[in-house]
Amino acid sequence: MSNQVLCCVVLCLLGANTVDGGITQSPKYLFRKEGQNVTLSCEQNLNHDAMYWYRQDPGQGLRLIYYSQIVNDFQKGDIAEGYSVSREKKESFPLTVTSAQKNPTAFYLCASSIRSSYEQYFGPGTRLTVTEDLKNVFPPKVAVFEPSEAEISHTQKATLVCLATGFYPDHVELSWWVNGKEVHSGVSTDPQPLKEQPALNDSRYCLSSRLRVSATFWQNPRNHFRCQVQFYGLSENDEWTQDRAKPVTQIVSAEAWGRADCGFTSESYQQGVLSATILYEILLGKATLYAVLVSALVLMAMVKRKDSRG
């Protein structure tokens, strides 16, 4: 590798930038069966001459796969075996994983710079998992656990816990929604999913997240809390022969309603709303019937008066 490229790698590891909209990669998550070819796209609109592809494995630093300094020219990096690239246009530098080998989830990053000796700008990355059998894919099971009374009484705070378990691969995004709107304040999510059985390569994963609100907010039974997990699984084109539902890309959610401390729960609140609605409909029906009866009596009186005058 040239000294210029080595310099760029050092700059990258010490602190490179990301540019919103400047460099795009797709897809964000990808899952493939062992032996298949996989192409990852990278586009940049920064008018940069140099472009790069890196791979990061769990617990390791970035490793250079390929780099290109001009159109129709590219050079191998440290781990070019099993990969191919092309640079037909200045703004595009696709990477193909040829005959993908089984491996834990790897993170692929595309970068660009004005020239090879300049600071590099990175895209958002692509997470790729390769497995020997698609039957290993499972969507998550999601549950929400309500706050403890001890926490509420001692701290006047309420922490809801969301637990997503039993999913593979670890291609998930977790979010909290309160009364139909996504929230970020008070949210603390694990940095990354953890293996349920660390010794197994194809172990399923789990992920937890916490949402902390005031006790008063939790004790309002009109407040609705939802934990949403976006799972990136198989596509519609992937072959599936198992006797369970195909684990396609999907959203899995769990929810909870605020719970008052005076016996007024979300269930009783909803039941009260239903009862009030029914009572309103009954009263409205009675009022309508009464109006019809009064109108009929008035009409009869008018007819009778007309007959008496005749």
From Swiss-Prot:
Consequence of changing residue 115 to A/H: Abolishes binding to M/matrix protein 1 peptide antigen
Places the protein is found: Cell membrane
CDR2: annotated span: 68-73
GO annotation terms (biological process): adaptive immune response; T cell activation involved in immune response
Signal peptide bounds: 1-21
Main location (coarse class): membrane
Region entry T cell receptor beta joining 2-7, spans: 117-131
Region (CDR1): 46-50
Positions of the Ig-like C1-type domain: 140-249
SUPFAM superfamilies the record matches: Immunoglobulin
Residue stretches making up the Ig-like V-type domain: 34-131
Keyword Glycoprotein assigned: yes
Glycosylation sites: 37, 201
Ranges for region T cell receptor beta variable 19: 22-114
Disulfide links within the chain: 42-110, 162-227
Topological domains, Cytoplasmic: 300-310
Span list, region Connecting peptide: 262-276
Function noted in UniProt: The beta chain of TRAV27*01J42*01C*01/TRBV19*01J2S7*01C*02 alpha-beta T cell receptor (TR) clonotype that is specific for HLA-A*02:01-restricted M/matrix protein 1 immunodominant epitope GILGFVFTL of influenza A virus (IAV). Classified as a public TCR clonotype, it is preferentially selected in effector memory CD8-positive T cells among multiple HLA-A*02:01 carriers/individuals and confers long-lived immunity against IAV infection. Can cross-recognize sporadically emerging IAV variants by molecular mimicry, inducing immunity toward different influenza strains.
Name the record gives this protein: M1-specific T cell receptor beta chain
Source organism of this protein record: Homo sapiens (Human)
